[in-house]
Amino acid sequence: MSIKIIIPSLGESVTEATIAKWYKKLGDAVKTDELLLEIETDKVTLEVNAPCNGTIGKISKTDGANVTVGEEVGEINEIADTDTAWINNKKQEVSQHTSEQLVDKPAMASNILAPSVQKLVTENKLDPNNIKGTGRGGRITKYDVLETINTTPITIETHAINKTNEERTQRVRMSRLRKTIAQRLKDSQNTAAILTTFNEIDMSKVIALRNQYKEEFEKKHTVKLGFMSFFVKATIEALKLIPSINAEIDGDDLLYKNYYDIGVAVGTEQGLVVPVIRDADKMSFADIEQAIGNLAKKAREGKLSISDLSGGTFSISNGGVYGSLLSTPIINPPQSGILGLHKTEERAVVIDGKIEIRPMMYIALSYDHRIIDGKEGVSFLVKIKNLIENPEKLLLNL
């Protein structure tokens, strides 16, 4: 009996993927849940495992092919559980044969790369034998290649001043992630009536509070106290005050969400991703800092799962970590708002009729004007400003 190998669900709003690499070939024996192939979406790399014991009877989509959810990419000739001894013997024969072939070719295994990984290696003129693989079975992943690139000294070559037009430009095909980012951002602008409102925050008190307790906080919770946990907490309180910003348009209806899954934008070598902190309103400051740290690490290593990226009721983007003074963030559909944070900079401000130097931050709220009125957008930022400038209110739930 033949069992189809089907592309599984890829998560919310993701319907297409690319086959990165098949790890089995026609006739290979496989066991239930054994790795068959890897597929790449615009967000993550996923493994497709064997649905049953048997042998590979058909491969209809090869490496590099584009596939969709539910599409058949091959078949397994099923073997009953009582025949697993035959599979084990078959695997042992293949393993022995492979070992004999590799006796005089120890570097061959490291050169078996997924197309996307091979492309990175080739473009950067790297030797795969010099890259330490951290993937399953020691295979080389995109993250391994990027780490090698980042740690390799740059050699600057001297060229003649006169160059041909071809040498002065370089054409590079957009990655699936970059194409998806471009499409989603353009769709957001074309669909939503985006409006941005601004405010500024005196960061003096929250900085003082953090400096006073950061060492004690880290010692107790084994995670550093940053400013993001304060902003996540303040954002949730502002969303409770203005429920429409935590809602979305669904056809002719407004869908109000009584939960708070906050997306936090993270920049990676591949592009921007927005992993989600689930039920952030139920978390402590330490829980939020831990969640942000874990998600950021997974994002940089390319190990985010579909569930890490799916959903989200509102997003926060902190351009301040890159030195941004002011920006107008773009909404992440189908959400209705996004908060933009920026760098803290000492500026002269008037306090009680006197000019003082204070650490100030500009904040921005981009929102969908179809569902959110201007008054609500302004009130949202004022609430956040009030809580950050008086952080004791966050601690006392005021």
UniProtKB/Swiss-Prot annotation:
Q: Which residues carry this modification: N6-lipoyllysine?
A: K43
Its UniProt entry gives the catalysed reaction(s) as: N(6)-[(R)-dihydrolipoyl]-L-lysyl-[protein] + succinyl-CoA = N(6)-[(R)-S(8)-succinyldihydrolipoyl]-L-lysyl-[protein] + CoA
Question: Per the UniProt record, which EC number(s) apply here?
Answer: 2.3.1.61
From the Swiss-Prot or TrEMBL record, give the protein name: Dihydrolipoyllysine-residue succinyltransferase component of 2-oxoglutarate dehydrogenase complex
The record, for InterPro entries, names: 2-oxoA_DH_lipoyl-BS, 2-oxoacid_dehydrogenase, 2-oxoacid_DH_actylTfrase, Biotin_lipoyl, CAT-like_dom_sf, E3-bd_dom_sf, PSBD, Single_hybrid_motif
Which PROSITE patterns does this entry report, sorted A to Z?
BIOTINYL_LIPOYL, LIPOYL, PSBD
* Entry keywords, A to Z: Acyltransferase, Lipoyl, Transferase, Tricarboxylic acid cycle
Which SUPFAM superfamilies does the annotation name?
CoA-dependent acyltransferases, Peripheral subunit-binding domain of 2-oxo acid dehydrogenase complex, Single hybrid motif
Q: Supply one GO BP term.
A: L-lysine catabolic process to acetyl-CoA via saccharopine
Record-linked Pfam families: 2-oxoacid_dh, Biotin_lipoyl, E3_binding
- Tell me the route in metabolism or biology where this protein functions: Amino-acid degradation; L-lysine degradation via saccharopine pathway; glutaryl-CoA from L-lysine: step 6/6
Q: So which domain of life are we looking at?
A: Bacteria
Q: How is the cofactor bound?
A: Binds 1 lipoyl cofactor covalently.
**Disulfide linkage:** none
Instruction: Kindly state the subunit structure of this protein.
Output: Forms a 24-polypeptide structural core with octahedral symmetry. Part of the 2-oxoglutarate dehydrogenase (OGDH) complex composed of E1 (2-oxoglutarate dehydrogenase), E2 (dihydrolipoamide succinyltransferase) and E3 (dihydrolipoamide dehydrogenase); the complex contains multiple copies of the three enzymatic components (E1, E2 and E3).
Q: What class of enzyme is it?
A: transferase
Q: What range(s) does the Peripheral subunit-binding (PSBD) domain occupy?
A: 112-149
Q: What does this protein do?
A: E2 component of the 2-oxoglutarate dehydrogenase (OGDH) complex which catalyzes the second step in the conversion of 2-oxoglutarate to succinyl-CoA and CO(2).
What cofactor is needed?
(R)-lipoate
- GO CC annotations? cytosol; oxoglutarate dehydrogenase complex
State the active site.
H369, D373
Q: What's this protein's family per the entry? A: Belongs to the 2-oxoacid dehydrogenase family.
Q: Any idea where the Lipoyl-binding domain is? A: 2-77
Q: Name one GO molecular function term.
A: dihydrolipoyllysine-residue succinyltransferase activity
